[in-house]
């Protein structure tokens, strides 16, 4: 059994990209080309990015990149990203009536869209949202198209107040994921946004002391050059890739920059921390429909005088 931690066992403000598997090489289990969510968090190389240390999930450097959206748009010409009011939206993780104790909400994704939209169009940033501002480790993920291809995913294992944390990692994941070019205005209608809040950090007894589809994992290991590295996958990654525990660990080692042959003895040297997450995803179409619904029902302030699709 794992030993429960109250807080993540990471350095202050360490961020990590946990989504998007790009052709990982697995030891003795074939190759898997595209993944929906993956991330690596090395523990000692490059410098800080936007006041936080980030980890690039493709290179294993300590410059992070990380976390979704769908096609379609409504014929709306005005909206107010500064408002923060929302209409009913999809429940977190697609559940029905079991989310009353969850912190994560669809409004958080809408706020991320507000922040990104205002940045791309050069408008003032939206006013503070109405959801809780409690501190949580968090990730923001962007995906695109009908097949929901990863477009950016970055987050932090340090607990951040949600208002400032989501604002920061919205832009970091959209514009500074080293695996992708920055998001553009033209891509907005095809985007999906996901917000993941990380909870229940526990020290695992060994590298197999976790469950696929339940736990996210963060591993710490010493590479072939004697340098400490870390890497992480969010809880959904292994299940989406149809990986077992060994495949997941081996993929994560490669994402963390380990280049030597992976043996069963080496896997036993890994220090593993497991965690869970609350996640919600909405599409750009749902975001626009929500904002329009609120405006029509008088719950938004007067919309700004600009064309949303100009």
Swiss-Prot record:
Keywords annotated in UniProt: Phosphoprotein
TM spans (from-to): none
InterPro entries, per database record: AMMECR1, AMMECR1_dom_sf, AMMECR1_domain, AMMECR1_N
Domain AMMECR1: 97-291
Phosphoserine PTM positions: 74
Disordered: region residues: 26-95
Top-level taxon of the source organism: Eukaryota
The UniProt record lists the keyword Phosphoprotein: yes
GO cellular component: nucleus
Biased composition range(s): Polar residues: 28-66
Protein name: AMMECR1-like protein
Gene expressing this chain: AMMECR1L
């Amino acid at each position: 059994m794992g030993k429960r931690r109250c807080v993540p066992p990471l350095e202050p403000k360490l961020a990590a990209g946990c989504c998007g598997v790009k052709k990982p090489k697995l030891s003795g289990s074939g190759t898997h080309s595209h993944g929906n969510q993956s991330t690596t968090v090395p523990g000692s190389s490059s410098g800080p990015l936007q006041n936080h240390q980030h980890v690039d999930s493709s290179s294993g450097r300590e410059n992070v990149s990380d976390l979704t959206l769908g096609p379609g748009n409504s014929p709306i010409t005005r909206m107010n990203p500064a408002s923060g009011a929302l209409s009913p939206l999809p429940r977190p993780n697609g559940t029905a009536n079991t989310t009353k104790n969850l912190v994560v909400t669809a409004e958080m994704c809408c706020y991320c869209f507000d922040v990104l939209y205002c940045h791309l169009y050069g408008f003032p940033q939206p006013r503070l949202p109405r959801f809780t501002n409690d501190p949580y480790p968090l990730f923001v993920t962007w995906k695109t198209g009908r097949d929901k291809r990863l477009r950016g995913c970055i987050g932090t294992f340090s607990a951040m107040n949600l208002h400032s944390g989501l604002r920061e990692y919205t832009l970091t994941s959209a514009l500074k994921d080293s695996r992708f070019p920055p998001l553009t205005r033209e891509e907005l209608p095809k985007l999906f946004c996901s917000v993941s809040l990380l909870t229940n950090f526990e020290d695992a007894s060994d590298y197999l002391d976790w469950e696929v589809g339940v736990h996210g994992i963060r591993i710490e290991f010493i590479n072939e050059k004697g340098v400490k590295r870390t890497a992480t996958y969010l809880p959904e990654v292994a299940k989406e890739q149809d990986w077992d525990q060994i495949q997941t660990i081996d993929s994560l080692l490669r994402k963390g920059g380990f280049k030597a042959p992976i043996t069963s003895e080496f896997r036993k040297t890994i220090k593993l921390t497991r965690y869970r997450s609350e996640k919600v995803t909405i599409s750009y179409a749902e975001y626009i429909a929500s904002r329009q619904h609120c405006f029509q029902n008088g719950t938004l302030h007067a919309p700004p005088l600009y064309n949303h699709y100009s």
